């Protein structure tokens, strides 16, 4: 029987297989990258060079957030605790623990511990940490119940829509100044968050920007 198709058509099935394979790999790679916690961030909990439990330090020992994150009230960016901060206690407490080897090495060499960053806003987004903390926004609102975390993860998406939810209705999040760093605070019986928030919103004249220029400068 005569061959009605040219010889080059013999390669079509192989080409189809290759194209499908490449597209499949691209889709699989895209899903793996863009939909993993490291990219979407919520739930992202990387392994750190030193295991650090906020549950032990905050809940059991009663340490205030500001002891380690000492610049949160005055700086635009919250600081990662220095090795000196850690060693203020750990030269005496659990001074030989294997878990703290990286801290002791940093103390000895002067090189910082290579902590893995968890919360990271894009460079095109402006955020001032001190402004929020000094106007009634608690650590809890952005970072979740860190006091209950044996290992820190990202609790909130910190996306534009998430930011705007607060900027459009800050009364749903503002709390008394004395309770900013109290991770267990809840409104007292007979009070509600919105009424408390409205009081501070009016007193502090809180009017967060909701236009592009407010956060993209």
Where are these regions (language model features)?
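Sequence context surrounding c-type heme c attachment/ligation sites in exported
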Residues: 45-100, 128-217
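Glycine-rich, flexible loop/turn motifs
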Residues: 35, 48, 111, 123
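Hydrophobic membrane-insertion alpha-helices, especially the h-region
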Residues: 15-32
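Carboxylate-rich helix-loop segments that flank metal/cofactor sites and access channels
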Residues: 101-121
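Short, solvent-exposed interaction modules
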Residues: 115-133
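Aromatic-capped interface at the extracytoplasmic side
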Residues: 28-46
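N-terminal Lys/Arg-rich, disordered targeting/topogenic segments
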Residues: 1-10
């Amino acid at each position: 029987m005569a061959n009605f198709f040219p010889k080059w058509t013999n390669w079509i099935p192989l080409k189809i297989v290759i194209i499908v394979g490449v597209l499949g790999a691209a889709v699989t790679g895209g899903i793996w990258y863009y939909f993993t916690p490291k990219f979407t961030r919520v739930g992202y909990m990387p392994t750190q060079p030193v295991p650090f439990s906020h549950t032990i330090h905050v809940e059991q020992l009663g340490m205030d957030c500001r002891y380690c994150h000492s610049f949160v009230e005055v700086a635009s960016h919250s600081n990662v605790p220095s090795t000196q901060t850690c060693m203020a206690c750990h030269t005496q407490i659990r001074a030989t623990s294997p878990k703290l080897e990286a801290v002791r090495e940093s103390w000895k060499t002067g090189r910082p511990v290579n902590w893995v960053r968890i919360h990271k806003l894009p460079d095109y987004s402006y955020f001032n940490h001190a402004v929020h903390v000094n106007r009634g926004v608690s650590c809890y609102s952005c970072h979740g119940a860190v006091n209950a975390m044996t290992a820190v993860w990202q609790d909130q998406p910190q996306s534009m829509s998430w930011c705007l939810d607060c900027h459009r209705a800050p009364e749903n999040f503002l709390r008394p100044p004395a309770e900013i760093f109290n991770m267990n605070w809840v409104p007292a019986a007979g009070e509600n968050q919105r009424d408390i928030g409205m009081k501070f919103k009016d007193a502090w004249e809180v009017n967060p920007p909701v236009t592009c220029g407010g956060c993209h400068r």
